């Protein structure tokens, strides 16, 4: 009887190992998807950490997944399953994209998306006097009618190139924000020409700086300028 039970346990173990082996034989996620989120005004849309995303929904599945964009408006995911996906950019400071497209994602799949930003930051200049940084720029709106209210504008200052909302030094960034709370159509030309000042930068340090304009859409999203390097003399 003991021998019979022992043989039974051996057979059960073999069947279990065989079943596990079959499961492990399935291909892993080896497809990739990359591209650019392009501004209709030209160039890549400047984004920030955790803002703009590419939303993907695999055909036949109900739960979507997302690919976060990088600060320079590029995106990439190298661990996707080969399949057809419904794809749309979302979450950024641009007019909502309502039409999804279907992309057959395999190894090395590339696709770019063009969006219309809420606000375009133009003529962005920086000047440093001692430890005080002055930032000047103007704002325009490709589509003014129906634009979400402009809440505020502010500098973003950090010691790394990863600089933006959620990635900045508060004492140089948030405290120097300027409240606007106006519709773009109610702003004068003077309102649209903005000057920000960042005082008391640390001598001998290098900073990375950009500006942003925040709107009252459902994401509280911001449009950003490019990132510039500021070297403060000792």
Regions found by a protein language model. Give the residues of each.
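Short Pro-Gly-centered beta-turn/loop motif in secreted/extracellular proteins
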Residues: 76-86, 92-93
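Short, acidic Ser/Thr/Gly-rich low-complexity loop/linker segments typical of extracellular
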Residues: 59-72
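Short, ordered, surface-exposed loop/turn motifs in non-cytosolic proteins
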Residues: 41-60, 147-151
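Beta-strand-rich modules
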Residues: 189-191, 196-221
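Structured interaction patches on ligand/partner-binding surfaces of diverse proteins
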Residues: 92-118
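Glycine-centered loop-to-beta-strand initiation motif
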Residues: 35, 69-78, 113
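Bacterial Sec-dependent N-terminal signal peptides
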Residues: 1-42, 233-234
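Extracellular fibronectin type III
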Residues: 217-234
């Amino acid at each position: 009887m003991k021998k019979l039970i022992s043989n039974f346990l051996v057979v059960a173990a073999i069947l279990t190992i065989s079943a596990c082996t079959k499961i492990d034989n399935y291909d892993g996620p080896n497809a990739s998807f990359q591209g650019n989120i392009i501004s209709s005004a030209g160039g890549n849309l400047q984004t920030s950490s955790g803002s703009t995303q590419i939303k993907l929904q695999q055909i036949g599945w109900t739960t979507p997944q997302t690919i976060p964009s990088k600060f320079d408006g590029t995106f990439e995911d190298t661990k996707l399953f080969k399949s057809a996906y419904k794809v749309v950019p979302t979450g950024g400071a641009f007019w909502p994209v309502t039409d999804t497209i279907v992309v057959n994602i395999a190894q090395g799949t590339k696709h770019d998306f063009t969006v219309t930003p809420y606000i375009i930051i133009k003529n962005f200049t920086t000047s440093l006097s001692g430890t005080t940084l002055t930032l000047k720029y103007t704002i325009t709106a490709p589509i003014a009618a129906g634009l979400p209210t402009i809440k505020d504008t502010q500098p973003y200052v950090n010691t790394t190139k990863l600089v933006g909302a959620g990635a900045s030094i508060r004492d140089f960034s948030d405290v120097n924000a300027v409240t606007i709370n106006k519709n773009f159509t109610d702003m004068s030309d003077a309102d649209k020409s903005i000057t920000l000042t960042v005082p008391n930068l640390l001598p001998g340090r290098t900073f990375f700086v950009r500006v942003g304009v925040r709107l009252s859409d459902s994401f509280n999203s911001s449009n950003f300028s490019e990132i510039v390097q500021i070297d403060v003399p000792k």
